[in-house]
């Protein structure tokens, strides 16, 4: 495996870009390696600048549910670009994507487009505070909702990877309005509401936590959050930036039949281009300017290229059998992977839901932040390096999720399993 060109580009990047990357986890610090610079992607594969091919289980951190360079998505982007890359004015494409979202998710009666998941969650919290007239929000240990100041309190994703649960630069005045509960622990939520019953504007939660590895909601947890928030007059916000359109044509809320007050989206709804969205009931969304008094704006919000890519992606998901294909591939891969893990004396575990999965270097059941943190990150780093040598690209952090796309096939599954088996045999004998 050659990496000379990637090493050269990383050195050059560090001269001009902090840390040489534009998002921390990409630096590969958590796996003790230099990052790979990717040249192109097609289907289930990516190719680095040194000519190495990898089966990709990062999929741009979730947006590429159809795989890389899907012909219909590429065509939609090209056709939109030929007419203009940005207008700073309303365009028909944004109505089309908004309608697709609203028709797919019953709780979303109106939706506002933004440019990232961070913008979506930040704007949703501002709206919740204005609507309720309250200041506090409740989030959960290890859950990541973007990098707005009020979310960088015991957060997940890159902050877990870096070992910094609360980012420097977040004023105490912001932090004191963010209350932190334990995922899958309703009692911890009840205690916070008991302490500040009239001050909590909203509870924001990943209905399937995907930023401390994959952690599934236990039976009754999401239902309990809905009951508690209603009882105290707070809003419930589902952060479906990862889970939206991942498991079905809609949100995870469609599957569990729970309607939050607000929903945030991103990733898949942009088809690989920068996008975010937040939506909910009309009486809440109509507080947003220019209809109401809660301000939010963006130069590139509703960008025609992102809207076209997102609409093309959602239409394919709605019309085809992608979800059945995703489940079949994931069941095949993870079913056989469980057999491999069982050979290692209870030192490994795995969580899966549909086309998301995480392999943890701990034998304990992973159900919350504290159990995630028992993972052996050193062994994961070694494992990751062995996978790359075998042509399999997993997230460069123990605390991120693997994504399966509709482009992955049985050939990919077979090679992945052989590579994982070999990598684990070597990793687990290392001290």
Curated annotation (Swiss-Prot):
Source taxon at top rank: Bacteria
Top EC group: isomerase
Reaction(s) this enzyme catalyzes, per UniProt: (S)-4-amino-5-oxopentanoate = 5-aminolevulinate
Keyword terms: Cytoplasm, Isomerase, Porphyrin biosynthesis, Pyridoxal phosphate
Localization (cell): Cytoplasm
GO molecular function: glutamate-1-semialdehyde 2,1-aminomutase activity; pyridoxal phosphate binding; transaminase activity
Keyword Lipid biosynthesis annotated: no
Residue list for modification N6-(pyridoxal phosphate)lysine: 267
Similarity comment text for this entry: Belongs to the class-III pyridoxal-phosphate-dependent aminotransferase family. HemL subfamily.
Name by which UniProt lists this protein: Glutamate-1-semialdehyde 2,1-aminomutase
Annotated source species: Syntrophomonas wolfei subsp. wolfei (strain DSM 2245B / Goettingen)
Gene that this polypeptide is encoded by: hemL
